[in-house]
Amino acid sequence: MTEEHNIPKVYDPASVEKKWYEFWEKNRYFHAEPEPGKKPFSIVIPPPNITGKLHMGHALDNTLQDILIRWHRMMGDNTLWMPGYDHAGLATQIKVEEVLKKEEGKTRFDLGREEFVKRVWAWKEEYGDRIINQLKCLGISCDWERKRFTMDEGCSRAVRETFVSLFEKGLIYKGTRITNWCVNCHTALSDIEVEHEDTLGHLWYVRYPVVGEEDTYLTIATTRPETIPGDTAVAVNPEDERYAKLIGKTLRLPILNREIPVIADSYVDTKFGTGAVKITPSHDPNDYEMGLRHNLPEIVVIGKDGVMTEEAGPFAGLERYECRKQIVARLKEEGCLVKIEEHSHAVGHCQRCHNIVEPLVSTQWFVKMQPLVKAAVDCVTDGRTQFVPERFTKNYTGWMENIHDWCISRQIWWGHRIPVWYCDDCGEMSASRTDLEKCPKCGSTHIHQDEDALDTWFSSALWPFSTMGWPDNTELLKQFYPTSVLVTGYDIIFFWVARMLIMGMEFMKEIPFEKVFIHGLVRDSQGRKMSKSLGNGIDPLEVIEKYGADTLRFMLITGNTPGNDMRFYWERVEGTRNFANKIWNASRFALMNMEGYDKDAELAPYTLADKWILSRLQDTVKDVTGLLERFELGEAGRAIYDFIWSEVCDWYIEIAKPRLYNKEAAAERATAQHVLATVLVSAMKLLHPYMPFITEEIYQCLPHEAESIMISKWPVADESLVDPEAERGMNAIMDSIKAIRNMRAEVNANPGKKIPAIMLVSEDLREVVAHNDSYIKLLGGIDNLELRQLNGEKPENAMAAVVTGIEVYLPLAGLIDVEKETQRLSKELAAMEKDLQRAGGKLNNAGFLAKAPEDVIAKERAKYEELSGKIEAVKKRMAYLAELK
């Protein structure tokens, strides 16, 4: 090794990251080509929206994938990570509409469909790559040469093929039924695009007069009085004896005075409200189903804009919630309002804009799901596709067993326009894989295409195979489909995972992925979801700019367990930054002491420390590889951390220093250099998937075999180097050194002062301790070490500690000034007791507890507990010193 291999004193992530990412891309290390006979490993990226900006969820999700990809690349697999992004129909349309309104004061309707769609494409070209470039800042190693877009030519062709194929099989149909409607986004939504939130509202109890029976009423309870004008019946349970005589009678609708029947239906819950419910088939999904069963008329009283229709009579033209207020006022005036109760219930909100969803009867396109789900459920229950953690299998199968038809049409302009044409002359409806110019039935050119666009998730459901060239049978599909693993959050199992399994089994007749690796959400330090409204979001790019991408990546993964949410703590970011600095400094030290290193030099026999660290390396390689195979990426990262920090840096390097510094003993120095280089190179390889930049920088400076660490070979354990005896002996010595350090700290002894020690050692450890007592002297600050038999004479007036097979004694003579140390501790105790009294006073103050924020009270309690613990420790130390006087 020469001077050029030295690395700077301080690690600068920004310059290192830019340099190596450009190097990797230039050398096309991310790129994959089909290679028959070579083991494939493939992942398709969950495509981020083109409107997207990198957030912590993206950072976690993509780092998990990158670790798996980099690991398998080093394992020698033919590794493809297919990147791309999603057109995000509704989200993108809303974004461009906002820009249009702000910059030009126009709406999409002012531009017209064709011009507006052109504007969206222009916006996509300008901003679409933003999140891709942000992912590159994170170190993501996708095959960017294969970047796809859900509306590119190939994906659009796949969407057309899928739609027409399902249409021809009768699995896509156009129907009129009740759907979720967003009055703000002006489009239908599928069931899973509606977020149900527990909301504190009211139950209004309203009495409906019985026709022909004076002073006889049937009282109902409703959460939506604004829909009363759309009532076409009142329902009771046929088993409810309270209302048996009223079944079949007629009621008069309050305010509008229209007559409606009393019907019996077992769906009615006798315990809800009064046990009698109003039925509004056009504005409630359950009422709609009941209306079909009883052939009830459907009266639409709320329009698609959330405004009351003409059918609402005197309330026409009112916004739906203003109508609610006025109807309640009229009910009071007419003496029909019995009472109002507070009532908590789940209210559906649009996932995109968060407005309250309105159930409305409309004509939409649907996919029949029941004929498609069996194959998608079977492939999971028989183990062809496995969820990790396994508990999510139940979530998936449970939802699939109760699935409803999928509403796939959206009343928007940006997206895959539904490939159906209508003939204005003969009325024929035709689905086509290519754009039609004339009616296939009558030949008329008077045709028009359906105005609606497909749900964004329709194209996303085809992602694992549309990105690889389907419907053509490409070489890419042959090599890389089914993909190896899908990495995604539990929040889109139903939106995306289920639909990919359905489409994969239907069109490829094969699973889309072998494993589904589920992770949780990244929450703030208080466990809250990060959001704009709370102002608690943390920008990953800011973390990268300040601490480096490696720090963010390693912190996210080691703080994560499969399937569970994690909390973001700045303290953990700083802790990981310290780990990066530790690695850097250790590597810098090693390189500074590699002068004259020759890998072919004659070596001296391995020392105990050499044997131990090489054995521990093999153990770590096996542990990390096994954990990665089980998708326990956080545990694997922590195992690497412990090995590098707690074993290589804290112990081996410190023990190796005398040999590295001694240029006179060439063979011994060469051996220490060889072992340290071997261990560091292997450690960097293990760490590379997690921290790709710093490991590449260090690898390039160390003796190495590949032109880049990312295409080097993953370490394989060498069983000939596994040495349990060396590990046992070294553990005994390390435990002894820790005991010495703890005893010195306990009495506040000068850490730089050399002291004598006596060790009583068991027969089976005596030889190893005797031959390696230099380690104890070096790291324990011992100048004279006396070894005795374990059952031999125990020294008096000495501190003692017991570890496995060894008793360690430190004679007190000259170790500390007992009187001086006692005085110091007395002052420390008095100050802490004063602070404890102050904290206790606050916690016993009712006013403080009533007025102070919860986090302030929690901090005060934590302070009180911490002080109590410290006081107890000081008292014990003083009691111990008192015994020594």
Write out the residue ranges for each language-model feature.
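Non-catalytic terminal extensions that flank enzyme cores
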Residues: 1-56, 73, 79, 338, ...
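Alpha-helical support elements that line or immediately flank enzyme active sites
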Residues: 58-60, 285-290, 499-507, 640
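Protease-associated
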Residues: 214-279, 283-289
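Short, solvent-exposed turn/loop segments enriched in Gly/Ser/Thr/Pro and often Arg
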Residues: 36-38, 46-47, 80-93, 147-155, ...
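N-terminal catalytic cores of NTP/NDP-binding nucleotidyl/phosphoryl-transfer enzymes
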Residues: 35-96, 150, 159, 220-222, ...
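Feature 926 captures the class I aminoacyl-tRNA synthetase adenylation module centered on the KMSKS loop
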Residues: 205, 398-458, 462, 506-549, ...
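Residue patterns forming the tRNA-binding/recognition surfaces of aminoacyl-tRNA synthetases
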Residues: 5, 10, 19, 23-27, ...
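Secondary-structure transition/capping motifs at alpha-helix termini
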Residues: 70-78, 99-109, 133, 137-142, ...
